[in-house]
Regions:
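Conserved hydrolase catalytic core segment
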Residues: 139-182
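Conserved HGGG/HGGXW glycine-rich cap/lid loop of the alpha/beta-hydrolase fold
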Residues: 62, 68-112
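Conserved catalytic-core motifs of eukaryotic protein kinase domains, centered on the activation segment
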Residues: 88-90, 113-119, 180-181
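Flexible "cap/lid" subdomain of the alpha/beta-hydrolase fold that forms the substrate-access gate
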Residues: 122, 164-294, 299, 303
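Alpha/beta-hydrolase fold catalytic core
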Residues: 2-74, 98-100, 328-344
């Protein structure tokens, strides 16, 4: 018999690479699917246990969410900062409702509001707010309260609908020249922030921000804010922020409108900005806040001690007191006008 030997040829490396790539691909698909279901179940759970307060009102083919409490006039209208929903006012609205009617709302695409087909500029947001108030049957006069970017919106509202506005409170409001006056290194950080927000928006449908703890521990906040459409709208507002600044720069004086300007404590610790940028940033901010207070001959300015940018969360009593003072001034001025009209 012939001498024969059997040789087992090795499996090519390419074969094993294909197996590994396929396995990784399948694993990624499974993890993405698991994250997708986790996110959707979590959103549904949060909103089931914390249902939407207030109502949704049609403003021209899409609906915006508004929540009004209390009674009396003028009506206080709360406009949140960039990417924030109505829940940013949760510590102040119940207190304001004790002395007048107060409404918080969600801009289009945020919280419980639908997306809008219109450009996301501050002028458009002011127009949408006026339509929302009108369609919801909430009559002027209004005391407008704007936090951060919301300050642009309420100033544009006052410019467009001056006869409907009885007073204004600016809560650490943005200034239309802030990007020009801040250190360039700080503006460069904004570009990094945009990239981070783009990643978070893409990751949101798969539950990654929630898993990383970015949604927070308050279920009421999660129900309104922790969802894909809110993250996407926040990113859009971030990208159109310069347009809002340019629009606001065209608005003029507020005349003798009752005005309160609240500013964060420049000595409060700042964790997300390099130490060498904090002082020049705060110096510029202080000057710009003074300029905001001088928009009206009745303007006042208060620094909220031990408060960050979110004064309404850190020092809600300061915000409530400022709003109360402006409401009282507006009522007094209206009373004087009524008496003057009766004497004629």
């Amino acid at each position: 018999m012939p001498n024969t030997t059997t040789t087992n040829s090795p499996v090519p490396v390419r074969h094993w690479l294909r197996i590994i790539v396929r396995s990784v691909f399948i694993l990624v698909i499974l993890l993405a699917a698991a994250g997708f279901f986790y996110e959707n179940i979590s959103e549904a759970r949060d909103r089931r246990f914390h249902p939407m307060p207030g109502q949704r009102v049609d403003v021209g083919g899409y609906k915006l969410h508004i929540n009004c409490t209390g009674q009396g006039a003028p009506v206080v209208v709360l406009d949140s900062g960039l990417g924030d929903s109505n829940v940013s006012w949760m510590k102040v609205q119940p207190q304001i409702a004790k002395f007048t009617r107060v409404c918080s709302y969600d801009r289009a695409g945020l919280g419980y509001s639908d997306n809008s087909p219109r450009p996301r500029t501050s002028k458009v947001m002011a127009e949408e707010l006026q339509t929302l108030l009108q369609n919801a049957g909430i009559s002027p006069p209004y005391v407008l309260v704007g936090h951060s970017m919301g300050g642009y919106n309420v100033r544009l509202f006052a410019s467009l609908y001056r006869s409907e506005v009885a007073g204004m409170v600016l809560v650490d409001s943005s200034h239309p020249e802030q990007e020009k006056r801040f250190p360039q290194a700080l503006n460069d950080m904004d570009k990094t922030w945009v990239r981070e927000q783009e990643f978070m928006t893409l990751a949101m449908p798969f539950g990654i921000p929630r898993l990383l703890g970015f949604c927070g521990s308050d279920a009421k906040v999660r129900a309104a804010d922790c969802n894909f459409h809110s993250y996407r709208e926040g990113l859009t507002e971030l990208k159109t922020f310069p347009e809002g600044a340019a629009e606001t720069a065209t608005t003029g004086s507020l005349g003798d409108l009752p005005l309160a300007v609240l500013s964060h404590d420049p000595n409060a610790p700042v964790s997300d900005i390099p130490a060498d940028l904090v002082k020049p940033m705060n110096d510029a901010w202080e000057q710009m806040q003074d300029e905001l207070a001088h928009l009206s001959s009745r303007g006042t300015r208060t620094i909220a001690k031990n408060s960050s940018h979110y004064i309404q969360l850190d020092r809600p009593e300061v915000v409530v007191e400022a709003i109360r003072n402006v409401v009282d001034q507006a009522r007094q001025l209206q009373s004087e006008r009524n008496q003057s009209a009766e004497q004629k």
